[in-house]
Swiss-Prot record:
Subunit structure: F-type ATPases have 2 components, CF(1) - the catalytic core - and CF(0) - the membrane proton channel. CF(1) has five subunits: alpha(3), beta(3), gamma(1), delta(1), epsilon(1). CF(0) has three main subunits: a, b and c.
Name of the protein described by the UniProt record: ATP synthase gamma chain 1
Family of this protein: Belongs to the ATPase gamma chain family.
UniProt entry keywords in alphabetical sequence: ATP synthesis, Cell inner membrane, Cell membrane, CF(1), Hydrogen ion transport, Ion transport, Membrane, Transport
HAMAP family to which the protein is assigned, alphabetical: ATP_synth_gamma_bact
Main localization category: membrane
Function summary: Produces ATP from ADP in the presence of a proton gradient across the membrane. The gamma chain is believed to be important in regulating ATPase activity and the flow of protons through the CF(0) complex.
SS bonds (residue pairs): none
Source organism: Photobacterium profundum (strain SS9)
Molecular function in Gene Ontology: ATP binding; proton-transporting ATP synthase activity, rotational mechanism
Location(s), subcellular: Cell inner membrane
Lineage of the species this protein comes from: Bacteria, Pseudomonadati, Pseudomonadota, Gammaproteobacteria, Vibrionales
GO cellular component: plasma membrane; proton-transporting ATP synthase complex
Amino acid sequence: MASAKEIRNKIGSVQNTQKITKAMEMVAASKMRKTQDAMESSRPYAETMRKVIGHIALGNLEYKHPYLEVREAKRVGYIIVSSDRGLCGGLNINLFKSAMTDIKGWADQGADVEMALVGAKATAFFNSYGGNVVAQVSGLGDSPTVNELIGTVGVMLKKYNEGLLDRLYLVYNQFVNTMIQEPVIDQLLPLPKSKDEEMQRNHSWDYIYEPEPKPLLDTLLVRYVESQVYQGVVENLACEQAARMVAMKSATDNAGDIINDLQLVYNKARQAAITQELSEIVSGASAV
């Protein structure tokens, strides 16, 4: 059995770690509320854009934008959004597993896969994995902006415009609630048709384009892709803070359990030492 002094040192070490994890839990909780506000503020815009684009995809426009044309999928692109920092449980690894499963499905069909990465964890994982990474960005911080993403998104859009990609997907974690974050793979291009059954059933109208659809759609469709990627980044950030808060709370609770166990061991060691001292005193007195 370890000495009482060694056990006291272990208890002190665990207590110091517990203070750190408790502080990280509180910081993550504060940041989570801020990122949730940002996520909820941008969601209506992203969802409205998705509805508008879904309606356009159902329409019969004379001008067929390349983003509306469905091509045979020989080359597939992914924009994968991860966190920059760790200590957030299995958030990133679950996302990577989901992405790898989907990538393998396309690879088995003979499609070439290219990736654009957002976040340091995705960069580290897929560079070591050996994937075909064509663009990457990290260090976005807790308040990302669309301008910081335009470069990475632009690389994939340029490839799609040049016919070097036939599909483009966005991979990110979707915030369900504080305890649940789900990996999601959304198709960005070609534009997915609306899944709204009522819209499909009653699709008897179309937008009026003034003066013509081309200049509007050329701008709108690019903005749509940028808005969806931005929403994915904001959602992933909220997921990161929630997962980190839960992970740090679990670590703090586990540290408390370890301290209680060590305290019990310490008490036993101290009791054994006292008993031994008493035995020695009694033995000495008997000898006298």
